[in-house]
Amino acid sequence: MYAHFFVEAAFPDQIITWTIAFICAAGAVMSMVGDLAASAIKRNHNIKDYGKLIPGHGGIMDSDCTDDVFSCHSDDWTALVPKVRYKEHSTMKKIAILGSTGSIGTQTLEVVRNNPELQVAALAAGKSVEQMEQQIREFHPLIAGMWSEEAAADLRSRVADLPVKVVSGMDGLLEIATMPQSQVLVTAIVGMIGIRPTIAAIEAGKDIALANKETLVTAGHIIMPLAAKMGVKILPVDSEHSAIFQSLNGEPAGRIEKILLTASGGPFRGRTREQLQNIQVEDALKHPNWSMGRKITIDSSTLVNKGLEVMEVKWLFGVDLDQIQVIVHPQSIIHSAVQYVDGAVIAQLGTPDMKLPIQYALFYPDRRPMPGKRLDFYELAQITFEKPDMETFFGLKLAYDAQRIGGSMPTVYNAANEKAVGLFLDRKIAYLQIPELIREAMEQHKVIENPNVEEILETEASVYDFIEKVYSERQ
């Protein structure tokens, strides 16, 4: 058609006619390119990776108009640029929070305060009855849980005037995890106590906002396949894993060359073992950047927390252990990054505020406004990076060793650390004994390949007994 149009064109209208024809032809070519691009993107959705579990990792996008991934026609030249965005949701989202009185739990409730689209369906805590009562009166959950029945009985008497069901123990956690009124379970609970409720919630079809490291560290081989089977989302809440999640931006695992996991280095960065001989509890609880709970603050100082995060990264994003590189970044501005096979590095930056990854997980795939301090690049004096000192802080190296061995060894690493940190917080052992006890527990353990939940919990109990025995013998 276009060739015939050119032949019959006569000067002086020829230039105009040729121009019109060229525009028409260009439009046809652009349309063909758009169809091919849309087809390619749709084919990309079929890539089998962790996109089904980590929704931003191979997620489905939607356009401004029809099913076409390109935006509608406009007189503005920017309409030629492909525009993709996620659908926004304005409906009420109901959440249940395990560990509502802890650091992550209370910050999650701050996010709820600022977002009327979020509603609390249930809360659970350990023993902070007074704080739980305050939360119930403010957020009006249907169910509230306490770990001990004694604490639950106290809470029932305090909130007898309110229409809330108070439950206790593991049965209570399981009831909250599976309640039909909630859509998302926030696992902000500390320790391996979170494994069973997380599994139950996944089996009930709940999306998981994951802040409980122990769940994936000890049972990642159970959790991730189950999540894939049930088609639920695992949404990371830890700042580093959220940063990786955001930096992936839908890229499949095959395009990842390396994951750069940042660490602040803790309060003792740069110190020698000799300088750590007399560290007291108060010293270790002074984190330079983040406001966190007591145990995780100690873990950050020993770099064991980073070791646990390495294990999480492996399970969350389906990468090999050798693809995970820990980088000490004292300013905690770059929360983590992804290096791709073409050499490009994409990172997520921001102020050290846990509410940002919490809110991102709860509203994913939307981004919502959030009050708070913004990152001001003019005020940044410097951004520096260092290699972690794995000789002084060898708890991080032990994490790599435990994950390479696999099976029940990550459970040993986690349980030994939990018990050792507890002894340190009780002022029963020295600071440097924490990683030493972890190493001893790993050396004496006979690995169980592919352990089930019961074997994981039995391993935890046996490690606790071992650490207690070692401690008693050395008194």
Predicted regions and their residues:
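Hydrophobic alpha-helical transmembrane segments
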Residues: M1-S90
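Catalytic, metal-anchored helix/loop core of enzyme active sites in primary metabolism
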Residues: M92-Q475
